[in-house]
């Protein structure tokens, strides 16, 4: 999730937004798909199914809306996401294990994914009250986010195709990025195995807020005087 936030910030800074969205979606689909495979025994499929239905409901509604946010909007949205998640009341009983909440989570996260390129920070909010281990959280979120990235690739694929190929990175660079994401996921799995649940949740939030601050600063810097 953290790697995806940083990667989207970099891609949004150097590529047209539609191309950045599709490229990020492909890389993160590989990363999250591999993460889900590594943790496949811990996936809670009941939650994944509910999130998927919410995704489809949101995609159906968004299919009638053609929008492609600009670079500043994406960077600002990326930076604000961790703070929005952090500012929500801690006693907010959003347990993704409950079907109505799962449907809401699926719809909200895919909408956020299409606007900012990532939905992980918001998805986190819905997992704070769920009775799962850190392995189950990571595994289930990996599948959920893979589905979200598929939706993003489908949504922005048309925009990217119409823009032509001149702004796309070379094939070797794309392959290198995918291989790096797989390597990072493998290392992350080993680190996850050694961490305690409390440490995992505490450090994730701190790092996310720090990255968010950098992205907000970048968006403000790009704003016209």
Model-predicted regions and their roles:
Residues 21-36:
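Alpha-helical membrane segments and adjacent membrane-interface helices in multi-pass membrane proteins
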Residues 30, 50, 54, 58, ...:
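Alpha-helical transmembrane segments of multi-pass membrane proteins
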Residues 17-25, 131-143:
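Membrane-interface alpha-helices at helix entry/exit sites of multi-pass transporters
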Residues 1-6, 116-120, 139:
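Hydrophobic alpha-helical segments that either span membranes
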Residues 5-17, 34, 38-113, 124, ...:
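Juxtamembrane transmembrane-helix boundary motif
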Residues 136-158, 170-173:
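Hydrophobic alpha-helical transmembrane segments of multi-pass integral membrane proteins
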Residues 4-8, 24-27:
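Short amphipathic alpha-helical segments
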